[in-house]
Amino acid sequence: LKEYGNHPSFCLLTYGNEPGGAKQLSYLSTLVDYWKGKDNRRAYTTAAGWPNAENADYWNAPNPRIQGWGEELKSIINAQAPSTDYDFRKIIRQDMPTVSHEIGQWCVYPNFKEIAKYTGVLKAKNLEIFQETLKEKGMEDLSEKFLYASGRLQTLCYKADIEAALRTPGFAGFQLLDLHDFPGQGTALVGVLDPFWESKGYVDGKEYSTFCNNTVPLVRFPKMVWLNIDTLRAPIEFAHFGEAPIKAADIVWRVTTTDNQLLTKGSISKDLAIGNNLSVGEVHCPLNALSEPTQLTVTVQINHTSIQNSWNIWVYPASKPQIAQPPYITTRFDHTALSKLNNGEKVLLLTHGQVSPQKGGSVAVGFSSIFWNTAWTRGQAPHTLGIYCDAKHPALASFPNQGYSDYQWWDVVSRCNAMVLDDFPADFRPIVHLIDDWFTNRKLGLLFEAKVSQGKLMVCSADLQNKLDERPAAAQFRQSILEYMSSDRFSPQDEVTPETIQRLLLSGKK
């Protein structure tokens, strides 16, 4: 305070971070009173994280967030179907300004190009080990793809965390962990920038600032996956913490397809006061004109400014076309399934709930990225970094995607097992990868095809059977697989033995 007390940016003070000790509350409460009496030009609290003292000017609390320590797969982002209409108003106290403590902590796969940047006494031996084990598993060529795909999921998780804070009325702010990686504590790859504050290539400042800025458009979507019998309705609001209110903001919203075809648009003129929870109108779009599975983008912006934000949503046909020549569908790799393969037939094997723990059944798959890192959290779930796939693979032709996790994958991955494919042929690649924790670097699959005996086998570890009327994206994923398998395009080239398939399952051959 002696040195920096007159600095114009010095407006908040805590003693430090996450204290311990039985007398922390009484000691730090006394410290708050002391400094409030000594210099009342700033806001004081006890510490970052805890404890919460009644005499503090604000609280820095760990609980207003979409994933907290120990929540694992029970967190908002993993346990609740995707939406953007939740906030933290029931968690925070309205009579005490609350700043959330260390939101984020979303991991990304290592960037092995970073190794060359360590030219001093510090060497990136951790990254070298991770790179070596990936090479041992025959996936060295996928490292940049894993980085990009997991990075896009990481960006989505940060966007969800930050927007939830901005939607919360009366919220005082958030403390983000982090913009750049922290190489310690087990290797916490939680930044969109590397430890040298340089880009990793999957998101730039322009995109990040659409949802983290002085002024941010927000839309409260009740869901992110829709049917074409629905009408999209979602309230638009703003968080505005600029220097002054905005008079008669020229607000425009539009709904477009991935090839930039306009479905509908609207305009609103509204004054924006300082604050958040500023309601301005709604997005309204009937979806019955969409007969094919479609990804849409909803964009809200203020004309003649750089202020804008956007979200992807998905629309699927409520009525699915009949499959002309469906494959044999089974949950058992038994004599019947083998006989059909021996006779040159097509088989879809659904393995959800039957994957051996040693072959992936024990891997905790979630929608979100890994929290902080599994080494430091003692294996907290999830253990994966989203999916990676070839977005143009014909098996996914009726399941629009961009090759990485977005909200349409939540239905699929929130009820799936990982399948460890390390003992498959070295060059074998699943159609849909689950990106493994870099500490283990296993070849994990969610969906793969193989030539088995004389037949054609498709194996999927997601639940594609239960409550599909409540899980439209899972139903559409199943439909896409079946359409592919009933076509001439389904022609697996990689041969796998029946014994290799059997080893994936809990009790081998059933």
List each model region and its residues.
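Beta-strand-rich binding/interaction modules
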Residues: I229-D271, V280-P286, E292-N303
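Aromatic-rich peripheral "rim/lid" segments of glycoside hydrolase catalytic domains that contact
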Residues: K38, L177-G242, I251, K509
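Substrate-binding/catalytic cleft of secreted carbohydrate-active enzymes
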Residues: L1-L193
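Low-complexity, Pro/Ser/Thr- and charge-rich linker/hinge segments at domain boundaries
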Residues: W314-R332
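Short, solvent-exposed loop/turn segments at secondary-structure junctions
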Residues: G20, P51-N52, G104-C107, H180-F182, ...
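Catalytic beta-strand/loop cores that center a nucleophilic Ser/Cys/Thr
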Residues: K38, Q80-A81, G353-Q358, N373-P472, ...
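Short alpha-beta junction capping motif
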Residues: P326-N373, Q454-G455, C460, I481-Y484
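Short, exposed coil/turn segments at beta-strand boundaries within extracellular/luminal domains
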Residues: N303-N309
